[in-house]
C-alpha cells in the first residue's frame, strides 16, 4: 500500500473522509533500488514493510517540491535527475483516500544519513519481490519495470489490509486468490501479472463439453486458441477455461467462462466435477 503516515501533514477532511496527498520515490543505482525498511515506529501502517522514500505534502507544495524535500530529509541526498512515473490512488476502508505521486530517480548528490523512519538499504531489483511488500506495491513495481509511459493506478484495500480492487488507467485489473497446494486460500490476493511473474499458485477452471453420438459414443467440443494467445497459440484446447477471480467459487467461475467464451448458459447441475490437477510451466505472459 505504501501509504505514508507522518502526523497530519497533507491531510484534507471531506466530511468523515480523510484525504491525503503524498510522494514516493525509488532511487536507482547500479541496478538497485534504495528501499526503506519500516521497523522503527510501533504504530506504523507500514510496520515491517519495505517501501520507497517520500512523505506527505506540506502546505502549498508541488509534487516535485515535496519529493525533493522528503528525499533530502530521509536520505541526505539531493536529487538531480528524476521522472514522474505515475499517480497511485489508495482507498483504505471507508474513510481514507490517498493520492500518491510516484517517482523514480537516477542521479543525486550528497552524503547518506540515518533515517528516523526505518533502515535504508540498496536492494537488487531482481530481489525486490522477495521483500515484505504491500501487494499493490508489487503491481507498480511491475509497471515501473514493464512500461515507460505515465500511468494511473487505483488500489483498494479492506480493513484487513487485503487488496480488493485494482484498476490501471481506469480499467479493472484481474485479481487472484493465492492458494495452498491443497486448494485452500492463503488469504493473499495478487494481481494477475504479479501472480504470473512470481509463480504464485492460483486456481483455474477447465471444462470439457461432451455429447453422445451414434458412432464412437461421444463428441468433444474443442476450442482453437487464438494466434495472439501467450500460451499454445493456434492449438486445439479444452472447451472452456479461465482463471478463478479473487473471491469467486470454482463452479461460478466455470459457468462464467462457458458463458463468456462460448455463449453457453448452464447451471451447476449441468456440470460434473472430474478432479483436481496441479500444473506448472514457464512462459512469457503479457499481463
Description of each model-found segment:
Residues 104, 113-143, 164-172:
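NUDIX/MutT-family hydrolases
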Residues 33-73, 159, 163-171, 194-206, ...:
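Conserved Nudix-box catalytic region and its N-terminal flanking loop in Nudix hydrolases
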Residues 136-160, 168-171, 286-287:
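Active-site oxyanion/phosphate-handling segment shared across diverse enzymes
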Residues 26, 35, 100-104, 122, ...:
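Conserved hydrophobic/aromatic beta-strand scaffold that supports enzyme active sites
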Residues 3-5:
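Cysteine-centered motifs
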Residues 32, 83, 111, 162, ...:
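Residue-level signal for well-ordered, solvent-exposed loop/turn and beta-edge residues enriched
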Residues 76-111, 125, 226-227, 259-287:
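Active-site segment of metal-dependent pyrophosphate-handling enzymes
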Residues 8-24, 30, 172-215:
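Acidic, metal-coordinating catalytic segment for phosphate/diphosphate chemistry
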Amino acid at each position: 500500500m505504501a501509504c505514508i503516515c507522518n502526523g497530519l501533514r497533507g491531510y484534507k477532511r471531506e466530511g468523515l473522509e480523510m484525504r491525503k496527498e503524498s510522494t514516493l520515490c525509488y532511487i536507482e543505482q547500479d541496478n538497485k533500488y534504495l528501499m526503506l525498511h519500516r521497523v522503527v515506529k510501533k504504530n506504523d501502517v507500514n510496520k515491517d514493510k519495505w517501501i520507497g522514500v517520500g512523505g506527505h505534502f506540506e502546505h502549498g507544495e508541488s509534487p516535485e517540491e515535496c519529493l525533493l524535500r522528503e528525499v533530502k530529509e530521509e536520505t541526505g541526498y539531493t536529487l538531480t535527475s528524476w521522472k514522474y512515473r505515475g499517480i497511485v490512488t489508495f482507498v483504505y476502508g471507508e474513510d481514507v483516500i490517498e493520492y500518491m505521486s510516484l517517482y523514480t530517480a537516477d542521479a543525486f548528490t550528497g552524503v547518506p544519513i540515518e533515517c528516523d523512519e526505518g533502515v535504508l538499504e540498496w536492494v537488487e531489483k531482481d530481489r525486490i519481490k522477495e521483500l515484505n511488500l504491500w501487494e499493490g506495491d508489487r503491481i507498480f513495481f511491475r509497471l515501473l519495470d514493464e512500461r515507460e509511459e505515465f500511468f494511473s493506478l487505483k488500489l483498494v484495500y479492506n480493513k484487513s489490509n487485503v487488496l480488493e480492487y485494482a484498476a490501471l488507467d481506469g480499467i479493472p485489473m484481474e485479481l487472484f486468490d493465492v492458494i495452498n497446494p491443497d486448494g485452500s486460500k492463503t488469504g493473499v490476493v495478487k494481481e494477475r501479472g504479479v501472480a504470473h511473474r512470481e509463480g504464485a499458485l492460483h486456481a483455474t477452471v477447465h471444462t470439457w463439453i461432451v455429447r453422445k453420438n451414434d458412432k464412437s459414443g461421444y463428441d468433444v467440443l474443442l476450442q482453437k486458441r487464438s494466434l495472439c494467445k501467450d500460451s499454445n497459440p493456434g492449438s486445439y484446447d479444452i472447451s472452456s477455461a479461465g482463471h478463478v477471480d479473487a473471491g469467486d467459487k470454482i463452479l461460478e467461475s466455470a459457468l462464467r467462462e462457458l458463458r463468456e467464451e462460448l455463449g453457453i448458459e448452464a447451471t451447476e447441475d449441468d456440470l460434473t466435477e472430474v478432479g483436481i490437477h496441479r500444473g506448472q510451466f514457464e512462459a512469457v505472459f503479457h499481463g
